[in-house]
From Swiss-Prot:
Belongs to the bacterial ribosomal protein bS20 family. GO terms for cellular component: cytosol; small ribosomal subunit. It comes from the Bacteria. InterPro entries: Ribosomal_bS20, Ribosomal_bS20_sf. Binds directly to 16S ribosomal RNA. This is Small ribosomal subunit protein bS20. The gene is rpsT. Pfam families: Ribosomal_S20p.
Length: 88
């Protein structure tokens, strides 16, 4: 348990930030899941539309240190590559 007032404030701040980050991470994972489901079905058009929503979420998560920025770029790259393979 925090004893000093600054430690108590830090605890409140961490709780707020954790809640925000959790919701952003959930949103990001949900958009990626929609893309992966469209790829699994082989629906290229749906995958492209879902990717248009997922890419900004991934990059935003990378900028806000919810995930590492290289991790965000890697996910975007791999999903884009998988969508491109659907066209073949």
């Amino acid at each position: 348990m925090a004893n000093t007032t600054s430690a108590k404030k830090a605890t409140r701040k961490i709780a707020r930030r954790t809640a925000i980050n959790r919701s952003r991470r959930t949103l990001m994972r949900g958009t990626v899941r929609i893309v992966e489901e469209a790829i699994a079905k082989g629906d290229r058009d749906a995958a492209i539309q879902a990717m248009k929503r997922a890419e900004p979420e991934l990059m935003r998560a990378g900028q806000q240190n919810i995930i590492h920025k290289n991790n965000a770029s890697r996910k975007v790259s791999r999903l884009t590559h998988r969508i491109a393979k659907l066209a073949q």
